[in-house]
């Protein structure tokens, strides 16, 4: 059945911003879809609100719209572009829900747009819990006993029928949002209430708990001829009760008999047929009772999912690409397997290695959050590793997480009997540390039976953990490390660093072990991912390392460049850095063999055909050096690029150079010049530039001395971090002591000597009421090219990754822009930058201060590139291999004249807004953690608003970030601190003019009354500064009030918009309860006056709904015309 010829144009909907449960995997799948569609000669119209994606690059589609994924905006684009079909199955839950909304609104019918990949009926049957339950029954399979509830009253009736514990599952949400396991009525009301709220269909499934059962997933595909194949079975190491995104997962499955697996396969095939997915893929989750073998179908996703990306990378089978071809009418037997280039896609993949995925968490960013892992996903990223056996694969995956203390360790004495008892209690509750606690408990003498009783993790896996411990004990106690023992340790997944710790070899121990290993000629070999267990030759070089006998690397002729990726997504280092790596691969591939090293299965950079060679390996010194040494034997290497993947590869630069690896672009010495506070101070002094007064400290006494010399408030942070990790605004000595005590505790015990830290704390004067600016630039040693000047909407103090920003800047004068340009040139020249640099500045009372400089790609590079139409990372890659900025102007990569710092009359305005994951993180009693922003980054993703002026662009950014966007009428609650009350009357008067009603606490209402502005008084709430987030709220009744506090009004749906500026001393004040309630209700809320000023302009601008919709291709053309004109 050949491709359909009636489809000439297709709209693809992306997944929007990176959020927990929906991350970079949809950029990967969407990019594959766009490439397939264009190869087939189909016009592609792409809509996505996330600028930090490869799929929104202009060459990926014929018309690319970086716009909010809302029904009115999508309808405008459909009306303009008139696509023949809509493909919604590659953009996660966002795209699926958007397609359903377009169908229900009659938009698809109105414009005669066909849904391909999955029908509305199939989406409904797969996503709606009640309909799916019927499909399962018709397939002859079993669901957990369950019932549907639309209200808490119905929830209570079901609880009476089934008893506790109960599982709550909402329909049409991703990452288990709104789901959970309830053990009593309070938990049930909290979880089910959130589930009903977050489900677009306002109902939840309440089902019997099957906690402790084994969990499996099947990834299936089906075509029009009813050919069905299972791409990959995946096993969760955690039993049912932990969301699959938060569990360690493995492929192939280890704990099913062949008969059980065939039964799962038969059920899966019956369900994909019953749901009606006939031109694409789906993911089905199963639970198996370990005692009886009873099989329960948990749920399905009738689309490409997070597990699809994992299965694709695990097997080499490109699910998204094939799903797109199936949607166009091809059948599986007509599609070629790209990896073998000799077998059809109808051959089920077979693997002869073990794949392990380990999640990465960020609980440290959300103090007070409940660390318990449940059915609602909480991890922010993941790493994957491949190896010859499970132990080796697990060891590689755990070190790929790139987080201190995340690998097994055997430091110090064995745990005592009391400690083992405590560990056995701790592992009953799943947390991110559970596997380390299991390993420590086994190390201390706990039996495998005790571990199983506490965790219900399958005994096969527990046995593997015990075997790793046994090997570690051998290594620790051996008189001599023989070649045989060293190889056994490597097969057990132990790194050189872990072995060095076991042998107590000190700081140089890792190098000592490597030299010993090399003296034995004990090195990893590299095997190929080929989809067919080596039955056919692989044409694509996709490699993993293992300690086996024969390497499968092939010689090459061209000079190679190795690019180090960014590893697992995390807060502070996300998809933006994968974007810059992919651009470097695309550009350098024209002249060099590109070799990509990364361990993140979600990303475009780890697609099998993106680079000339892909190594799915941990980004550690040991693993990267082994790749370099192996590739050196295969052909010439120009060098390694470390400045595009964020802090992870950057931290390897100095050691790699010391080991003889050539580093391209900015040298490790120059990196240190910018990162080291004292050395950077000298650069600024020579350039006659201001920095906030600062000091450094290695102890509490030094910190106190520095803070007193500078004057409170101060900004305190560790050296060499990304995403503002550990950064805090400190107002007095008591707060400073707490900060230093915590830093000493978090530092590795063996590096702390008598209260002194291993690396200095940086202490800066905090600039209050300053305007913060980010500048991204290119430098080739002589010429500077400004990529973009981005003005923050919030004042200084909010981390640049969380702040909204605008490009071009909206309030800077020509003179201020000139000073920024001159300052950036002086810093880039002084630091010896060769490639990208990001400098953060602040203007306070028209004095320019340099906050920091980063001689690498920054997270704003994709945004600046999309806003200016210039691929900065591509130009940077060419500069790193020795080309000049003038050469990039000549070849068209950069503007022929001027740069991104120039402002042109009539230029479109771009606004970047951050997206925060607060609804995922709750305290143990269910309240959301505080949303107050500060110097430590907490956002997971970003959106971009693009329009003719700042108010319209800002309004679009809010529409993309908040479901429904900004209200244009209704009730506004206002509560501001004393400092902000001076600005309040102007804001309040404008709100009244716009038709809003103002609700305020008594103090704020009193200020407004003096200016003749009416407001309704609400009762004041009080939370002690030192209270626990879960402490009850005290209400103080005010005279003339409406008789309710604001939290009650938010919960009743009476409030539409919130302005709540906090007191300076932190989040445990009254505002916390307000902000928490607003997050639970999905209300737009703003915590700074500067941002609320922008909100007012935006509301005024969009009252007529007159957004300008323009593709970025048209925008780039307009920009080049304006540049030529000016």
Curated annotation (Swiss-Prot):
InterPro entries in the cross-refs: ATP-grasp (IPR011761), ATP_grasp_subdomain_1 (IPR013815), CarbamoylP_synth_lsu (IPR006275), CarbamoylP_synth_lsu_oligo (IPR005480), CarbamoylP_synth_lsu_oligo_sf (IPR036897), CbamoylP_synth_lsu-like_ATP-bd (IPR005479), CbamoylP_synth_lsu_CPSase_dom (IPR005483), MGS-like_dom (IPR011607)
Residues annotated as binding Mg(2+) 1: 285, 299
Molecular-function GO terms, alphabetical: ATP binding; carbamoyl-phosphate synthase (ammonia) activity; carbamoyl-phosphate synthase (glutamine-hydrolyzing) activity; metal ion binding
Recorded catalytic activity of this chain's protein: hydrogencarbonate + L-glutamine + 2 ATP + H2O = carbamoyl phosphate + L-glutamate + 2 ADP + phosphate + 2 H(+)
CDD domains: MGS_CPS_II
Every MGS-like domain range: 964-1126
Binding locations of ATP 1: 129, 169, 175-176, 208, 210, 215, 241-243, 285, 299
Binding, Mn(2+) 1: 285, 299
Signal peptide stretch: none
Residues of the ATP-grasp domain: 133-328, 681-881
Superkingdom: Bacteria
Keyword Manganese: yes
Cofactor: Mg(2+); Mn(2+)
EC number of the protein: 6.3.4.16, 6.3.5.5
This protein's GO CC annotations: cytoplasm
Oligomerization domain: annotated span: 403-551
PANTHER family: CARBAMOYL-PHOSPHATE SYNTHASE [AMMONIA], MITOCHONDRIAL (PTHR11405:SF53), CARBAMOYLTRANSFERASE FAMILY MEMBER (PTHR11405)
Protein family per UniProt: Belongs to the CarB family.
Protein name: Carbamoyl phosphate synthase large chain
Originating organism: Bifidobacterium adolescentis (strain ATCC 15703 / DSM 20083 / NCTC 11814 / E194a)
Gene for this chain: carB
